[in-house]
Structures are given as structure tokens and as C-alpha cells.
């Protein structure tokens, strides 16, 4: 099975070390462009662009990278409760059209009550997933070309429609990650790819089996991806030394503050990440070559595969054997590590190298009439 390998655009900062300004660098458009172009040339399928108040806006970043890349896809966040599904569908179709079919979307419900309150969202965990399920249903139907009337608990639209369809049919693929029961149910019913953070293989296997069974109950099949950091070097000793350097500037106070911030979230996935290390520096290798040091201060994906190329490839193939075909990777700093992964890891894997998409012809169209419909040629009798 060929594997889709994604990289990451660090719109929330980058550097050589975690938790310090030491070794950090400016993350401006030029730097993000360097990373995107490196990923494009090295054969990555796409890049994940993060979302949240600590990040630059993912949609604007993705749009700015379209003209400077050729085949790279952009995995961009959809934010239910923050954006209406109709506006989000219009944005999604536009990004897909402008990129010639290189748009992918990642459903992000949010998990930090403080951040959500700042965005005007005051729903609890279950309500957010209810709203997300309604949002996704409307979003998908619009991209399928339907005129949508929907009267749900959280979402209400009347006569919603898109005038400009996406390039990808039936619609651009939808990704989603969540560990709670309600999150897995949403994934099983509506998304195309279920993502998990990098837990030990036995825990990932359990999740996959749960989601696969729930999808089957809806008469659906779903694909799987995993989000991991990677520290790969020519030798395993060098890789483990690099891992230790990454957290060498962390002090206990910074770790404690980070863990306190994570504790206030209601994300089951974040709780599972935190439980892998319990905020302690010792015993960070939680499974062979799976290191939890990143999660001491980084929210979300908090584990890294560490080792030489063949060793890390073997661990990736263990996850692939569970049914995972998409790997969303990153490393610090992201420009240099994009090359290291491409040069030291890719040769040991069956990597699906994306082709440069051919321009897709769009139907000729005049200006929309009364903002209501696109004029079409009328057959003469």
C-alpha cells in the first residue's frame, strides 16, 4: 500500500528548541513559502495548516501558497460554530477551484473553553459535536450541488446553495480527528478520513477498530491517518540526541504551565496525550521509538518517532499494517526537517508521489443574474 505523506506549516512559530526563544526564527510568508516549496519538490502529498488563536489564519495562508506550488495539497481547518456551513462551503469550493483541485479540509470542533469563548462559542463538549454534525451535513450537501433547507438544533438555513461547484467531485475530502464517543460517531457517519494522534500502536488499533465498526453500522467505509512528529537521523544515537536537544531548554515551570493549560480543555484526545507522560521528563519513550517529549509543552500531537531511516520506516509500516494510509508529519525546525525526512525516511517507504494536476476546464459563464443564478445558453428551436 502506497502511503500519503503530509508535512506541516508552522504558522504558530518554529525553531530548534521547544518552550524558549533560543534558536527560534521569524515565521513570515517567505519562510512558509520555503517550507511549502520544499514539501512540493520532495514529494509530500500535502501540508496540514493548523488553526486557533495561536496561529495565522489557515485559509489565507493556504490561498497564498497556491501560486508558488504545483502539486502540493492544503489541509485546511473547517471551524463549526465559528463559521456558517454555507459560508464555509463557498470558501471551500473557491479554494478548490483556485488551487485546481488541491484543497482538503479538516473538521476542527475546538476544545479550549477559554479560546472558544473568545470566539463567541459557549457550547459544551456534546453540544459542539451536535453542532459539528449538523454543520457537516449542510456543508457536504451544498458541495454536492443541493439547495439546502435545514432546521436543526444548532444550524438553520433556508434555500442555501452554491453557484460555483468545487473541482473535486463529489467534494474535496474531509478529515477529522476526535477520541470521544460522540467524535467517533461523527467521523463514522460523515467524514472521509479519521485522524488520530500518535499513540502507541495497540491504542491506535483499538481506535481504528471502534471507528471502522461504527462506520460499518452506517453502511460506510472510512480511511485512516495519523499525526506524528519525526526525528530521523543517519544513526539512532544521533536521533535520540536530537530529541534530547529539542527539550534541553525546557524548565519545570514552563512544563507545569503548559500542562495546566491542557488540563482545562475538554478534549479526550488531549487527555490521552497528557497521560502518556504525565508531565514528567523521565520514561518519555512510551513505545519502541515513540517519544512523548514534544507533548510536555505542545498541545495536540505530542509524540515523535525517533531513530534512523530504516527504524522509523519500520514503525510507520506497523501503523500502516493497522490500516493507516496517510501520515501527517512534522519536525523542528520544519524547513530542515522536511528535507531530512524526505532524504532519510522516504527511500525506505512506499511513498505515493502526487502528480502535477492538469488544468481543469471550467464552463464558460456570464455574470450571475440578480445574484441568483448563472445564465446558460438556451437551445434555439
From Swiss-Prot:
Any one of the GO BP annotations: alkanesulfonate catabolic process
Enzyme class: oxidoreductase
Catalysis performed (reactions): an alkanesulfonate + FMNH2 + O2 = an aldehyde + FMN + sulfite + H2O + 2 H(+)
One Gene Ontology term of the molecular function aspect: alkanesulfonate monooxygenase activity
UniProt KW keywords: Flavoprotein, FMN, Monooxygenase, Oxidoreductase
Assembly, per entry: Homotetramer.
Main function: Catalyzes the desulfonation of aliphatic sulfonates.
Protein name, as recorded: Alkanesulfonate monooxygenase
Species this protein is from: Escherichia coli O17:K52:H18 (strain UMN026 / ExPEC)
Amino acid at each position: 500500500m502506497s502511503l500519503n505523506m503530509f508535512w506541516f506549516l508552522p504558522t504558530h512559530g518554529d525553531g530548534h528548541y521547544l518552550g524558549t526563544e533560543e534558536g527560534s526564527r521569524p515565521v513570515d510568508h517567505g519562510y512558509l513559502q520555503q517550507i511549502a516549496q520544499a514539501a512540493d519538490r520532495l514529494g509530500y502529498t500535502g501540508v496540514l495548516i493548523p488553526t486557533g488563536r495561536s496561529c495565522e489564519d489557515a485559509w489565507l495562508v493556504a490561498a497564498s501558497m497556491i501560486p508558488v506550488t504545483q502539486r502540493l495539497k492544503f489541509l485546511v481547518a473547517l471551524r463549526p460554530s465559528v463559521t456558517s456551513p454555507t459560508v464555509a462551503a463557498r470558501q471551500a469550493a473557491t479554494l478548490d477551484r483556485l488551487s485546481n483541485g488541491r484543497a482538503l479540509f479538516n473538521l476542527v470542533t475546538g476544545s479550549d473553553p477559554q479560546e472558544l469563548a473568545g470566539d463567541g462559542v459557549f457550547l459544551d463538549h456534546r453540544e459542539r459535536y451536535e453542532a459539528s454534525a449538523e454543520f457537516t451535513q449542510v456543508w457536504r450537501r451544498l458541495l454536492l450541488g443541493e439547495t439546502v433547507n435545514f432546521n436543526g438544533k444548532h444550524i438553520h438555513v433556508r434555500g442555501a446553495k452554491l453557484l460555483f461547484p468545487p473541482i473535486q467531485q463529489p467534494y474535496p475530502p474531509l478529515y477529522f480527528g476526535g477520541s470521544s464517543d460522540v467524535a467517533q460517531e461523527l467521523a463514522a457517519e460523515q467524514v472521509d478520513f479519521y485522524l488520530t494522534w500518535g499513540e502507541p500502536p495497540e491504542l491506535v488499533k483499538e481506535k481504528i477498530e471502534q471507528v471502522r465498526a461504527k462506520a460499518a453500522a452506517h453502511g460506510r467505509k472510512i480511511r485512516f491517518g495519523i499525526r506524528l512528529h519525526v526525528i530521523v537521523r543517519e544513526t539512532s544515537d544521533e536521533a535520540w540526541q536530537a530529541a534530547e536537544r529539542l527539550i534541553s531548554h525546557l524548565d519545570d515551570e514552563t512544563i507545569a504551565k503548559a500542562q495546566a493549560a491542557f488540563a482545562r480543555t475538554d478534549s479526550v484526545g488531549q487527555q490521552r496525550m497528557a497521560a502518556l507522560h504525565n508531565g514528567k521528563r523521565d520514561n518519555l519513550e512510551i513505545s519502541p521509538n515513540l517519544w512523548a517529549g514534544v507533548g510536555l509543552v505542545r498541545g495536540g500531537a505530542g509524540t515523535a518517532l525517533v531513530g534512523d531511516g530504516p527504524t522509523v520506516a519500520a514503525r510507520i509500516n506497523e501503523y500502516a499494517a493497522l490500516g493507516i494510509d496517510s501520515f501527517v508529519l512534522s519536525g523542528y525546525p520544519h524547513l530542515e526537517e522536511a528535507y531530512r525526512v524526505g532524504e532519510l525516511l522516504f527511500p525506505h517507504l512506499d511513498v505515493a508521489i502526487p502528480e502535477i494536476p492538469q488544468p481543469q476546464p471550467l464552463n464558460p459563464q456570464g455574470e450571475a443574474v440578480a445574484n441568483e443564478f448563472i445564465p446558460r445558453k438556451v437551445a434555439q428551436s
